[in-house]
Design a protein with these regions (language model features):
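Extracellular glycan-interacting surfaces
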Residues: 1-147
């Protein structure tokens, strides 16, 4: 076998993270320094995801192993009003909503890691750049610190 570079994902920006849907292996998400991309056909074609996602540094992607339509994306691009934070899609990555809305945002919106609790899939761990680890119930927008 030989290596083959895919078309449709920028080649001139860092690739931060890649996640594959465990139920639909042809569906893959790629987080770059500028945007989030997705393929439905195993990498033959790619599309840039929008749907309320900000510009920026996508550093973490988490797909619900029991429901591939639920996807979380962590963004590390932080400015005063836009970017950074945790975003959730319930339609396979077409539309997105913040799970840390304004007024209740993480102390650091620079998100670096996401994980489900191995004992409770309703709990999400959020690792930040400089403010520790936070826990959020998956269906909630209330974050609590584990520090």
């Amino acid at each position: 076998k030989t290596w083959r570079q895919v078309d449709g994902v920028p080649r001139d920006v860092p690739i931060n993270t890649i996640a594959q849907d465990p139920q639909r292996p042809d569906r893959v998400f790629v987080g770059t320094k500028q945007a989030l991309f997705m393929t439905h056909d195993g990498g033959e074609t790619w599309s840039r995801r929008g749907g309320n996602l900000p510009f920026g540094d996508f550093t973490a992607i988490l797909i619900n192993p029991r429901n591939g339509d639920e996807v979380f994306a962590g963004n590390a691009y932080q400015t005063t009003d836009v970017g950074g934070g945790v975003f959730r899609s319930t339609d396979g990555g077409t539309t997105w909503a913040r799970i840390d809305p304004k007024g209740r945002r993480l102390p650091s919106q620079r998100i670096w890691a996401l994980a489900f609790d191995a004992h409770d899939q309703n709990v999400l761990f959020v690792g930040s750049h400089s403010a520790g680890v936070y826990v959020v119930p998956r269906m909630s927008d209330t974050l609590s610190s584990t520090q």
